[in-house]
Amino acid sequence: MSSDISNNDHLVLSDNPDHPANLIPSLCAKFWTLGWVTGTGGGCSIRENDLVYIAPSGVQKELMKAADIYVLSLAAQTASLRDRVYLRSPPCYKPSQCTPLFLAAFTKRRAGCCIHTHSQWAVLVTLILEAGGGPGGAEDAREFRINNIEQIKGFGKGFEKSGNLGYHDTLRIPVIENTAHEEDLTEFLEEAMDKYPDTYAVLVRRHGVYVWGDNVHKAKTQCESLDYLFQLAVEMKKMSLPWITDITPVKTRRS
């Protein structure tokens, strides 16, 4: 990792609460209350045109400040995972190992925001799938599927597609295996994105989830919707209720 000779603090100084350097700490403080970024885990990154703003590694997310944020140019990055060029680096922290995974969402999906959580519900869902508790049993350990739940409407139909999923649609989220070092997940996350071109998220077994969106609003609401569905799925499993059901659409007078 290398950084520019000037610290470029002007990139993170703004009175605008919606500036990425202010928004990331604000979002992470909210995520901390939800248990998504406990113990310095998890993170968030926002892309504004070519500039990418990233929460650092090892910081208590509920205490993070704008001055803690890294900034890089997306166009200036190389294929190497370990040779990042930063426009602005805080003096007291290390770059997040999530960085190449965030960049994958920005380059492959043109996302405006990517959120990484260590949600317990996300982890539990991957464990249920690992134990053969998914709709397809042990053969289905690498995909979370659920349908006929209202909150599914919170997700877009897919990359470069207009509109959202419907109540009767099936939401599919790929699952990849965890690695000892976070940055080593990158190739597997990219493979999952290629295999599931319409997904807005990738689960990491025994670890958490990466969720992205066209902008901060969409990434945040999709992350919230997904966590709701993960919790619901765990509770449904306790009651032996299936995640995939065959429900006949209700006919209305205007149908």
From Swiss-Prot:
GO cellular component, one term: cytoplasm
Lineage top rank: taxon: Eukaryota
Active site positions: 150
Chief localization: cytoplasm
GO function terms (MF aspect): methylthioribulose 1-phosphate dehydratase activity; zinc ion binding
Biological process (GO), any one: L-methionine salvage from methylthioadenosine
InterPro entries reported for this sequence: Aldolase_II/adducin_N (IPR001303), Aldolase_II/adducin_N_sf (IPR036409), MethylthioRu-1-P_deHdtase_MtnB (IPR017714), Salvage_MtnB_euk (IPR027514)
Pfam families the record matches: Aldolase_II (PF00596)
Record-stated family: Belongs to the aldolase class II family. MtnB subfamily.
HAMAP family: Salvage_MtnB_euk
Functional note: Catalyzes the dehydration of methylthioribulose-1-phosphate (MTRu-1-P) into 2,3-diketo-5-methylthiopentyl-1-phosphate (DK-MTP-1-P).
Protein's name according to its UniProt entry: Methylthioribulose-1-phosphate dehydratase
